[in-house]
Amino acid sequence: RGVVFEDLNGDGTYQRDEPGVQRVLVSNGRDVTMTNRVGAYMLPVREDMDLFVIQPSGWRVPVNERQIPQFSYTHKPGGTPEALRYGGLPDTGPAPQAVNFPLRRVEGDDRFTCAVIGDSQTYSNYEISQFRDSAIADLVARDMGGNDCMLYLGDVVGDDLELLTRIFEVGSAAGVPQWAVVGNHDIDLDATAYANSADTWRRLYGPAYYAFEIGEVTFIVLNNIYFPCGIEDADVPGREFCTESENARYNARVDNVQMEWLENLLAEIPQDRLIVIAHHAPFVSFVDAASPVHQNDNATAIYALLEGREALSLSGHTHTIENHSPGQHFEGWQEAVGVGPLPFRHIIAGAASGNWWQGDFNLDGDAQALQRMGAPKGVLMIDFAGTSYEERYVGSRLGEERGQWVDFSTPAFREWFDAINTWRNENWRERDPVPPVSINDLPDTRILTPQDLAGGTFITVNVWNGAAETLVEARINDGPAFPLTRTQEGAGEAPRIGAMFADPFAVKRQATVGRYAIESRSGEARNRGYEGFRGRAFQGPPQPQSSLADRNSHLWMGRLAEDLPEGVHRLAVTSTDRHGRTYTDQLVFEVREARPPARFRTDVWEAGARQ
């Protein structure tokens, strides 16, 4: 029991002269109740629970010095019943007689912007520094405030849970509340029971699932990382790994108690509100369409609870940007998790770490780390107005005016791609340590010969946040505009994979990473090359990062005419998103009868003066 009250003096403690706030939802993680006319509530005590208030519209819960919302009380008598690497929960003792929740009034929260951060996934303090100098630097420059928010979609850190303290301290520089989802790299991976797997997160951040409101939007945060999975999961085809694997594994699903809580919560939320479901593993994805473990087992049950409502799914996990429109579907979804055409929009928000902080350095000193489908690392920005919203993806340190890459897929590019991709797929212990080709072996894709045009040269446009509604047009010189075609229709087909569907702009930057070869005489072995994941060494000859953009749900293409005249040409490409926002890129390319030599002509130099 307790009181939800207006904290008039800002001390966080309930005084009798401070009025209660009525009709506020409070939950014990299963049951949901509403405060009465004096702000009082009563709920059953559960043996292991997070008791939390659901921040109502027009009000704000307090935040601590790290801008982490303070809206919950954790109850776990005896604490975590097993020793965990990062400590878990201490003994919380018996339940207190009352838990009161302070609120403060705010005005004008009908319009706000939320910075949605997928997979910052910092495995080290070095990577937190890169996060600080990329995504957070952009948010600070944007001058967020008022009723804006940040929402991390899980994998905030990479397995070292003590890094949570610093990363949220760094994120607090943006000056707005930091709401967060727990991901599979934010849990206690040495826990032997699901009930304990998020205990360190609960101590360092707060509940693993909860809800909050801003304006006319209800955000529902779910924990869909079930770790360790077991017999209940293994009974579902494709999840046999839950009992057969030597090491404990996770499965993507929302547990039964949480599903009960979700049903109880939705029963209290008016039908006219926008519901934003935030979770780490996507309900479904394009890039992992056939994978059971990386898509949510009980997505269809969640869809049933949301039927008839305006809803939006936000997730991370895949290190891709995927903007899936209602009605879209891909081969593999039905077989993996029983999902067909989507009932509402699903957005996988990309990754602030890009491709796990890999790749060579940008000018600002952070890794390029282009994602699995070639988009830059960055942040999804969503502007809310009432129950409407407009999403846009902002690449780190690239500015808001840029939203796509443009290049050409030539026969030479596809041959080069196949050579390096074949090498990548060989056993790394047995293959030649030096790749068969590098970026230096790729002919300039913007010098085209008649043979290139006859063999198929295509304009490629990677529209980072592209969706089914996106329109892409190209224009050569002063000629008429012509449409380009999305390489995936989203009509039930399988992901198309390979050189023909690769993004040349991204692959050029992913395929030869010079950081592998960094050496010095310092004597510190760990300063060679670079480290990623849990201290894994990336050393040796320059070679590709761990992912190449060999498939894409947001790539548009169009074939160049075979009879383009020789000379220098201008290409302009404009994409228009579903909200009418446009991005335009222009580049210069050449058509030459023969490809000129790429390097300094030493033969001419050494031949001396012409007679």
Label each region the model flagged.
Residues 70-91, 161-269, 293-314, 318-393:
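Extended active-site neighborhood of metal-dependent phosphoesterases/phosphodiesterases
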Residues 12-20, 27-44:
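Short, acidic Ser/Thr/Gly-rich low-complexity loop/linker segments typical of extracellular
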Residues 2-6, 39, 101:
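A short, amphipathic beta-strand motif
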Residues 332-466, 470-473, 559-561, 571-588:
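Binuclear metal-dependent phosphoesterase catalytic core
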Residues 80-164, 610-611:
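N-terminal active-site segment of His-dependent metallophosphoesterases
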